[in-house]
Amino acid sequence: MARRSVSIFNRLLANPPSPFTSLSRSITYMPRPGDGAPRTVTLIPGDGIGPLVTGAVEQVMEAMHAPVHFERYEVLGNMRKVPEEVIESVKRNKVCLKGGLATPVGGGVSSLNMQLRKELDIFASLVNCINVPGLVTRHENVDIVVIRENTEGEYSGLEHEVVPGVVESLKVITKFCSERIARYAFEYAYLNNRKKVTAVHKANIMKLADGLFLESCREVAKHYSGITYNEIIVDNCCMQLVAKPEQFDVMVTPNLYGNLIANTAAGIAGGTGVMPGGNVGAEHAIFEQGASAGNVGNDKMVEQKKANPVALLLSSAMMLRHLRFPTFADRLETAVKQVIKEGKYRTKDLGGDCTTQEVVDAVIAALE
């Protein structure tokens, strides 16, 4: 033991730490005993560009020696249901990383994304639409978090043909789910030092359904006096987003509105290819690209292997924080943003012509 101590001491003398090392760190992260144990994460590569971008994440995780092991399952959007073993895997592991799953337009195949959310009660979708240093956009100072109810609303999947040529689609809003998503939005704002929560609605027309959603948000807002609460009609919200997006902070929405607003805000802030996101419930979480806007089915992008991996890499940083691996998360996020800021390695959607692999190699080289 004494010899080993001398050896370590000699190595330190030969390679003294930089006097600036401590300046680059925050106050020490003190893990709890056992926090470094490797975690198993369910991996669903998905359709289209999914295998490309999830493969990018696997490479970067391996390069970082992150304590994460992936349990891979092949799930495709044209399946009639999510295989039971996949559901059991997510229930067991608590966390899933997912590429995009295509949902056929029309026909009798239901969305596997909705099946996963309902089966696992993953009720909140979160998309962080924020300007990324180095990407030139029309608007600056955009930092919007869109929190969307994930399990009901227009996406309940309750549709039927009443008589030939007449289809009825039901929008379901409940007090329980509305209060739950409102509580999550305010809790997120409180824990992340956000100053304002905006509820998005169409209660001027859908007076009962969206009226119940607003009533629930107002009830929850009473318990967070330090956070400003306001409301905006969804069509006005869309106009305000493209005119003055910096006015928004946290937005809480029913299902359909949140999907549209998140993709719009992502486009304003720099593009869907760089916006991270995740879905969370009381027991489970699924991390994926924050806003997809049709990238899943881009066959040309798949053939050329030029899918942008940035959004899923940043979503993976969110996942690492969720797993309580904050240092690995910081390293990954810093490396990705450094590559974007330098501007040398970018895919076509960001003004470059790089392949997915070239971006991945640049991120790995930038890891500290």
Curated annotation (Swiss-Prot):
Mainly expressed at a low level in pollen. It is found in: Mitochondrion. SUPFAM superfamilies: Isocitrate/Isopropylmalate dehydrogenase-like. The keyword NAD applies. GO terms for biological process: isocitrate metabolic process; tricarboxylic acid cycle. Keywords: Magnesium, Manganese, Metal-binding, Mitochondrion, NAD, Oxidoreductase, Transit peptide, Tricarboxylic acid cycle. GO terms for molecular function: isocitrate dehydrogenase (NAD+) activity; metal ion binding. It comes from the Eukaryota. Residues 1-26 form a transit peptide. Pfam families: Iso_dh. SMART domains: Iso_dh. The keyword Amino-acid biosynthesis does not apply. GO terms for cellular component: cytosol; mitochondrion. Performs an essential role in the oxidative function of the citric acid cycle. Belongs to the isocitrate and isopropylmalate dehydrogenases family. PANTHER family: DECARBOXYLATING DEHYDROGENASES-ISOCITRATE, ISOPROPYLMALATE, TARTRATE, ISOCITRATE DEHYDROGENASE [NAD] REGULATORY SUBUNIT 3, MITOCHONDRIAL. Heterooligomer of catalytic and regulatory subunits. Interacts with 14-3-3-like proteins GRF1 GRF3 and GRF8. This is Isocitrate dehydrogenase [NAD] regulatory subunit 3, mitochondrial. It comes from Arabidopsis thaliana. The gene is IDH3.
